Amino acid sequence: MHVFWFIPTHGDSRYLGTSEGARAVHYDYLRQVATAADTLGYEGVLIPTGRSCEDPWVVASALAPVTRRLKFLVAVRPGLHQPALAARMAATFDRLSGGRLLINLVTGGDRTELEGDGVFLDHAQRYAQSEEFIRIWREILSRSHEGGTFDYEGEHLSVKGAKLLYPPVQKPYPPVYFGGSSEAAHDLAAEQVDTYLTWGEPPAAVAQKVADVRARAAQRGRTVRFGIRLHVIVRETDAAAWAAAEELISRVQDETVAQAQAVFSRMDSEGQRRMAALHAGGTRRSRADLEISPNLWAGVGLVRGGAGTALVGDPQTVAARMQEYADLGIDTFVLSGYPHLEEAYRFAELVFPLLPAEVRERIGGGRAAGPLTGPFGEIVGNQYVPRAAQS
């Protein structure tokens, strides 16, 4: 099991859908979140992409020098990047960071935003372009270790004599992650990527996705790993966690929800459509309606695009729900929570000790006990080491 955190380059707050409790997106804060994730033992961080975010490559380049082990899951965008240039960027970052780059292949699902970026392709064309893009990207990087060149002529992209002089640290290339819920996305995942990511849907729906992508990959003689993108709201008690969930959306106005859902509804993303269906396009607001599966809450998706669900509960419950997904084949959890700095600490303190032993070993850098200094807390009376309370 691999546990990642999230760098909130599109903003952060104690509440959703309002400027109350908001935090400015500046380097000092992003650095705090990154160094916290690194120190606490998260394996990596996802850096989001899109016009509402700071550029992920620039952010990752700024954060790599202030972290030690943290990996960076950074987007490449077919249509915005050329594959040869993207390969060069990836190899350079991987070399300078000591092999800490992971690639997030993002096709995009908002036609309005895509057209603003100069991409005028429909859904099918974008996936065809993405398939050509990542094929070229992989080949250029793979051949760079032996000094080889690559020729390719496709419908959307072509290269002749493509060559990379400085190969990446990771062989044959930094691992490729990708998410999508359409038939075309599942085919692309089966054919080209290393880890297929899904947004946080109920376990039965996730099981169907995993089975489908796994079967398509097997038909091609490949195996694919699986990950899930979720928010988390964990507190010491179940009641406190659900109270925090309600508080998170307590300032949201109906008008704000309507505006957000109007934007989401225009997208041609199958994943976004599935997220919206979980809360009926923003019409469901009570806990009874938004708890779409035990401890899986769709409240985040009222105003947030992309991943719109959160695991909510006490540490034991959240760890158990994660294990349910792991039993389906999920081995990577890309998590986030509001505010991202505080929730990174809460999750690490409360849930990390409950994860499988091999995860705790990796988090603790070889120490089975976990990531906290000591890990015993503050010395009592200048000499006594605190012990865990007996239940």
Curated annotation (Swiss-Prot):
Q: Which domain of life is it from?
A: Bacteria
Per the similarity annotation, which family is this?
Belongs to the SsuD family.
* Name used for this protein in its record: Alkanesulfonate monooxygenase
Which cysteine pairs are joined by S-S bonds? none
- Enzyme class of the recorded protein, top EC level: oxidoreductase
The taxonomy runs: Bacteria, Pseudomonadati, Pseudomonadota, Betaproteobacteria, Burkholderiales
Q: Which PANTHER family does its entry note?
A: ALKANESULFONATE MONOOXYGENASE (PTHR42847), ALKANESULFONATE MONOOXYGENASE-RELATED (PTHR42847:SF4)
Described by its record, this protein's role is as follows: Catalyzes the desulfonation of aliphatic sulfonates.
Q: Does the keyword Cell division apply?
A: no
GO MF, one term, reads:
alkanesulfonate monooxygenase activity
Q: Which GO terms describe its biological process?
A: alkanesulfonate catabolic process
Instruction: For this UniProt record, give its keywords in alphabetical order, as a comma-separated list.
Output: Flavoprotein, FMN, Monooxygenase, Oxidoreductase
Return the EC number: 1.14.14.5
Q: Sorted alphabetically, which InterPro entries does this protein's record hold?
A: Alkanesulphonate_mOase_FMN-dep (IPR019911), Luciferase-like_dom (IPR011251), Luciferase-like_sf (IPR036661), SsuD_RutA_monooxygenase (IPR050172)
Q: Which reaction does it catalyse?
A: an alkanesulfonate + FMNH2 + O2 = an aldehyde + FMN + sulfite + H2O + 2 H(+)
